[in-house]
A protein has these predicted regions:
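Alpha-helical interaction scaffolds
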Residues: 1-210
């Protein structure tokens, strides 16, 4: 059943959503209520579901919709939102740039990590829109990114990090402007970003035109 659940989650599209959601719900229920299923196996299922739903940036909106229903339907999924937050918290604090000509294998792995960070970020965006994640939590992540950006701009050889941080800030602010504009501190963050955009590239050690 766990293999079927993973397979069906990977097949989710707008066209298959209505049909597959019922199949997924039934299989999840069978696993969670099954005889002989250990707590460890149940937790592994929840972790796998979160991993698959949050790592597909092309289906973020659909996946957030499904996850929202799982939280409502199954008690064991209710606290799993903390796993989503933990995953994103870790991704936010582990941004680095790797040059392809220095270490190509690590460069490829880092690109995958960067893509995953943006995918989880977009998943978080749609969870906020569904009121599963708090505005304050997401705004705190934006503040973390902005602080990291402010620090990195003035350091040597940080252009890769600056670009990655900037892309993540844009992803959150662009998609959540309406939801966040009344949060305390929003205007101050926008002012800071506006200030960054007026900096002269050549005067900053790691500032880029992006």
């Amino acid at each position: 059943l766990m293999i079927e659940i993973r397979s069906d989650l990977n097949k989710l599209t707008k066209d298959t959503f209505s049909r597959l959601r019922e199949v997924i719900f039934k299989n999840v229920e069978d696993v969670l209520n099954g005889e002989g299923i250990t707590d460890e196996e149940k937790n592994k299922l929840i972790e796998d579901v979160i991993h698959l739903l949050s790592n597909n940036k092309f289906n973020s909106e659909l996946n957030a919709a499904l996850y929202s229903e799982l939280i409502i339907k199954y008690r064991l999924f209710k606290n799993s939102i903390e796993l989503v937050k933990e995953k994103y918290d870790e991704d936010v604090t582990t941004i680095e740039a790797v040059l392809a000509h220095v270490d190509y294998e690590r460069f490829c792995k880092n690109n995958i990590k960067n893509d995953r960070r943006k995918a989880v970020g977009l998943f978080v965006v749609y969870l906020l829109k569904r009121r599963i994640i708090e505005k304050e939590y997401v705004f705190e992540k934006i503040k973390n990114f902005v602080e990291l950006l402010e620090k990195s701009i003035g350091e040597e050889e940080k252009k890769g990090e600056v670009e990655e941080i900037s892309e993540n800030i844009y992803l959150l602010l662009f998609n959540l402007k309406e939801e966040l504009q009344n949060v305390e501190g929003y205007e101050m963050i926008i002012e800071k970003i506006t200030t960054f955009s007026t900096l002269v590239v050549k005067e900053q050690k790691s500032f880029t035109s992006r």
